[in-house]
């Protein structure tokens, strides 16, 4: 049968399409190179963003584009799913992608953006250490490395993030309080220290920048993983160093500290993040009944 030859290279003269044709084409890696330092501060979060965007560029096979359409977005999400990414992980990666594309759009590098829809995240069970588990795990850490033991104590009693603790300087510890400056949300916070957290920072300064500056994340995680296997927690994926932050939060909530103060202690930007621990406050509604009982 007759099939017409379709000329896809028609030139439209509307102002809109003229504008489109003037837009240069960029790959995602090029856009990241252009804007990453403007959009994200230095730190571990920026490092993660860099690898997220690198992975997405690789999924897109480094193609250059002047508009990012829904189909491209769907193919990225589909590929991340095939790679075993959970919805929560996909949302983190999409947040980075959308922030970069919005900036590129604002600067006139990309003329169209897809609609980003958050994937539904399951409220994952928050695993924390019971005192007995902490004791066994910390003893195994200590038998391998005294510095890592001190750091473990500090993490579980201050609830700070691993990077925040390793980045501490001596100046950040004043009169039984510690100030975290290098935080994920770029807001400093100051928390008082428990006796054993204080003790964990009391070592000879020598040439060290801070109490845990002789350690790095890779080395600490290695020691942690060996200790974890030794005490029979090897198959529990959730027993990572970050569990110490969850453990601190859950102890505060179970001890009757109100959720707003727990938020301030942990340095969460939104209360919603802290609400993940709220259900642990088993008896915090009992006082409501007292108020309502007719005297």
Annotate each PLM feature.
Residues 55, 63-78, 82-116, 159-163, ...:
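N-terminal DNA-binding recognition helix of tyrosine site-specific recombinases/integrases
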Residues 124-131, 158, 163, 167-200:
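Conserved tyrosine-mediated DNA breakage-rejoining catalytic core shared by Y-recombinases
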Residues 1-71:
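N-terminal DNA-binding module of tyrosine recombinases/phage integrases
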Residues 91, 107-162, 166, 295:
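Basic, Lys/Arg- and aromatic-enriched nucleic-acid-binding interface segment
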Residues 66, 108-111, 121-139, 185-195, ...:
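DNA breakage-rejoining catalytic core of tyrosine-based enzymes
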Residues 106, 153, 157, 161-164, ...:
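C-terminal catalytic core of tyrosine-transesterase DNA break-rejoin enzymes
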Residues 26, 128, 182-186, 196, ...:
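Catalytic-site neighborhood detector that most strongly recognizes the C-terminal catalytic loop/helix
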Residues 194-236:
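Active-site/catalytic core of tyrosine-dependent DNA strand-transfer enzymes
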